[in-house]
């Protein structure tokens, strides 16, 4: 993983996307369980 010049490493993109998806799913379920799912 030394040749990361000019491009973003693929594992950073995968990690960021995974965290984003997990965060969105968590917020969605938290909002629906809290009664705020209808406002989203």
UniProtKB/Swiss-Prot annotation:
Alphabetized UniProt keyword annotations: Chloroplast, Membrane, Photosynthesis, Photosystem II, Plastid, Reaction center, Thylakoid, Transmembrane, Transmembrane helix
Source species: Aethionema grandiflorum
Pfam families associated with the record: PsbJ
TM region(s), chain numbering: 8-28
Subcellular location: Plastid, Chloroplast thylakoid membrane
InterPro entries linked to this entry: PSII_PsbJ, PSII_PsbJ_sf
Quaternary structure and partners: PSII is composed of 1 copy each of membrane proteins PsbA, PsbB, PsbC, PsbD, PsbE, PsbF, PsbH, PsbI, PsbJ, PsbK, PsbL, PsbM, PsbT, PsbX, PsbY, PsbZ, Psb30/Ycf12, at least 3 peripheral proteins of the oxygen-evolving complex and a large number of cofactors. It forms dimeric complexes.
Protein's name in the database: Photosystem II reaction center protein J
GO biological process terms held by the UniProt record: photosynthesis
Function (record text): One of the components of the core complex of photosystem II (PSII). PSII is a light-driven water:plastoquinone oxidoreductase that uses light energy to abstract electrons from H(2)O, generating O(2) and a proton gradient subsequently used for ATP formation. It consists of a core antenna complex that captures photons, and an electron transfer chain that converts photonic excitation into a charge separation.
UniProt topology in membrane: Single-pass membrane protein
Major place of residence: plastid
Family: Belongs to the PsbJ family.
One GO cellular component term noted in the UniProt record for this chain: photosystem II reaction center
NCBIfam families: PRK02565.1 (NF002722)
